[in-house]
């Protein structure tokens, strides 16, 4: 079965959740109907996700085969004083993630970024090996641009099943999206809610969002506020539905149960004329990371 038919459209993102929050939100999300839970070794909350999954399984809310669990290996970034992971390092990272998650396999394993310029292909070969031995069902990447993906092609290796990238109306990445679609690489969008005025407001939640962007998001004349009023939905639901209509999988993150419902339970269609208006909102590159856009890594 291809990832396109297997991966749920809406999943739970767990970035910046504590282990305790990850446990609670994983459990509550599964109870609501979520089946995709996304974590990573660098989130340091895989054990919390594991407890949420365990609780859901023990209560009979879901079976393991009904869940789609994603985790990620961080490749190592020499600019941050880290060595680039080798083939064996990646194999070990997956084993450690499986232990923390208390799982025999994960549905999707991603190389978290393209920072390992010397060992990118070696790392990708490790994921293909893990896929062949059944420890992962699908192999993918995150934050890889066309050049990075072309390296895989040039090595005569199969392309990733998916690429998880920052995607929202302010960062639409049309060239990369077209490349992924043309090459049958499924698109997972993260940071879908960047344009909201409420996005990342806590201390330490820094990004490249400018004051002008903040003002635009807060304005009553914001296109997303106007469309939310038109369709009688939440502003966040406009942003999520935009992605779903473009066939992107999404991973909205929240630590509020009410928002878990909002991010999952909505049913409306954005009219084509409004989709075109949203298309005009593109501002260019990524905004999520204070240190820069990972798609610009060499």
Where would I find each of the regions flagged by the language model?
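Short acidic/polar active-site loop segments enriched in Thr and Asp
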Residues: 35, 104-107, 137, 161
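Short, acidic/polar
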Residues: 17-30, 83-101, 147-150
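Acidic (Asp/Glu)-rich catalytic clusters
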Residues: 2, 50-64, 98-102, 131, ...
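Active-site mouth loops of central-metabolism enzymes
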Residues: 9-20, 73-87
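Beta/alpha (TIM)-barrel catalytic core signal, keyed to glycine-rich beta->alpha loops juxtaposed to Asp/Glu
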Residues: 114-298
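N-terminal binding-site loop/beta-alpha segment at the start of enzyme catalytic domains
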Residues: 1-67, 193-196, 295-297
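A short, structured active-site edge motif that brings together acidic residues
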Residues: 63-78, 108-109, 143, 167
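Active-site groove signature of glycoside hydrolases
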Residues: 101-118
């Amino acid at each position: 079965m291809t990832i396109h038919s297997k991966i749920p459209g809406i999943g739970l993102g767990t970035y910046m959740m504590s282990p305790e929050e990850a446990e609670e939100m994983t459990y509550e999300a599964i109870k609501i109907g979520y089946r995709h839970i996304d974590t990573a070794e660098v989130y340091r909350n895989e054990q919390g996700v594991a407890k949420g999954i365990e609780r859901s399984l023990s209560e009979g809310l879901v079976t393991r085969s009904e869940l789609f669990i994603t985790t990620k290996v961080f490749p190592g970034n020499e600019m941050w004083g880290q060595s680039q992971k080798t083939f064996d390092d990646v194999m070990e990272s997956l084993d450690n993630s499986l232990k923390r998650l208390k799982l025999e396999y994960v549905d999707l394993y991603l190389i978290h970024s393209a920072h390992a310029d010397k060992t990118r292909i070696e790392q990708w070969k490790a994921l293909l090996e893990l896929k062949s031995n059944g420890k992962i069902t699908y192999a993918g990447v995150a934050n890889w641009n066309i050049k990075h993906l072309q390296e895989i092609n040039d090595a005569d290796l199969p392309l990733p099943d998916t690429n998880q990238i920052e995607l929202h109306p302010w960062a639409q990445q049309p060239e990369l999206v077209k490349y992924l679609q043309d090459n049958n690489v499924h698109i997972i969008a993260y940071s879908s809610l960047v344009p909201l005025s409420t996005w990342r407001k806590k201390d330490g939640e820094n990004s490249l969002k400018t004051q002008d962007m903040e003002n635009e998001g807060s304005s009553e004349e914001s296109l997303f506020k106007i469309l939310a009023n038109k369709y009688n939905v939440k502003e966040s639901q406009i942003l999520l539905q935009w992605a779903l209509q473009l066939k992107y999988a999404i991973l909205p993150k929240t630590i509020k149960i009410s928002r878990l419902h909002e991010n999952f339970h909505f049913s409306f269609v954005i009219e084509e004329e409004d989709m075109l208006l949203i298309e005009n909102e593109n501002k260019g590159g990524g905004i999520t990371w204070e240190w820069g856009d990972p798609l610009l890594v060499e």
